[in-house]
Design a protein with these regions (language model features):
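N-terminal auxiliary segments of SAM/dcSAM-dependent transferases
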Residues: 1-59
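Conserved Class I S-adenosyl-L-methionine
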Residues: 15-16, 229-281
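Class I SAM-dependent methyltransferase Rossmann-like catalytic core
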Residues: 59-81
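Conserved class I S-adenosyl-L-methionine
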Residues: 93-102
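Conserved SAM-binding loop of SAM-dependent methyltransferases across substrates and taxa
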Residues: 103-115
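Conserved SAM/SAH-binding beta-strand->alpha-helix loop
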Residues: 123-127, 147
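A short acidic, Gly/Pro-enriched loop at the edge of an enzyme's catalytic core
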Residues: 147-158
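Conserved beta-strand signature within the Rossmann-like core of class I S-adenosyl-L-methionine
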Residues: 179-189
Length: 281
């Protein structure tokens, strides 16, 4: 059985043309245990088979504990109806990049549902990507910057953008002429029970609108699909504590509130999201 770094080397040899140097924007080729460009900027694979494309350190509040809980909730089926919808719009045997993939659970679930082709996940969080490298799927994982994607011009078929920021100028650059962006945006009732439990006295945190995000998407891309997906999910008993720690909502919650919820965790949660599919104009 091949080691992770050996599997990653094989993929790079086959797919090196997909990448470009994030420092000088020149093409790259495989040399040794990584990629190198004509200007000799070199990016070596880690033992886990991941690539670090940043030339600077990054501090994020997204940590291993949060990513682990998020992964368990995704694997529990919490987002299954959303992922089933996404599968309708994903091409087969093409190149798909998951932007802001975290621990890689969404890409893993889609792969298990039948997604084929070259799959790449990237995130700004090194911890998230190290966890993603443990996913039992054929995919490539890297740490990269959304504003300076390490991908060649017009080389990608689809960008997955699930609960993560967008950079449409870069998206248009790296997508093929017929390429698509599939974006999932939280709607007003998303995780409403959790927000109410975390912040019972803060109405601002219990209601919000992403209409500006939807408008921006429509300004940047030709919208082909705009669909709202809403349902209530029965949380498996063994996953109820993971729900409390799976998102940034938890960061500002008092210890007193957390303790109460750990004693009496939520049993149901509302999923309310917008599915957008846009194509380059």
């Amino acid at each position: 059985m091949l080691k992770k770094i050996e599997r990653a080397q094989q993929l790079l040899k086959k797919e090196a043309a997909v990448f470009r140097c994030p420092t000088c924007h020149e093409p790259m080729h495989v040399e040794g245990v990584g990629l190198i460009c004509q200007q000799r900027h070199q990016f070596d694979l880690s033992k886990k088979g991941t690539l670090y494309f940043l030339n600077h350190g990054v501090q994020t509040e997204y940590n291993k504990k949060m990513f682990t809980s998020r992964g368990k909730m995704i694997q529990s089926g919490m987002y299954a109806p959303v992922l089933n919808k996404i599968m309708h719009y994903l091409p087969q045997n093409k190149t798909v990049v998951d932007v802001g993939c975290g621990e890689g659970s969404f890409l893993a679930e889609l792969s298990q549902a039948g997604l084929s082709g070259l799959k790449i996940g990237f995130d700004l969080s090194k911890e998230g990507i190290y966890l993603a490298s443990n996913q039992l799927i054929d995919a490539f994982w890297c740490v990269a910057d959304l504003t300076n994607l390490p991908f060649a011009n017009e080389g990608l078929d689809t960008i997955l953008n699930i609960f993560s920021p967008s950079h449409y100028q870069e998206f248009r650059r790296v997508l093929k002429d017929d390429g698509t962006v599939i974006k999932i945006i939280p709607e007003e009732n998303y995780l409403k029970e959790l927000r109410a439990a975390f912040y019972p006295n803060d109405e601002k945190k219990q209601s919000y609108s992403n209409q500006k995000v939807v408008q921006r998407f429509a300004e940047e891309l030709a919208v082909e699909v705009d669909e709202r997906i809403t349902y209530c999910f029965d949380i498996p008993e063994e996953r109820r504590l993971d729900l409390l720690e799976m998102s940034p909502l938890e960061w500002q919650v008092s210890q007193e509130v957390k303790a109460k919820l750990q004693q009496r965790p939520l049993e149901k949660i509302t999923i309310d999201v917008r599915l957008l599919v846009g194509r380059k104009r």
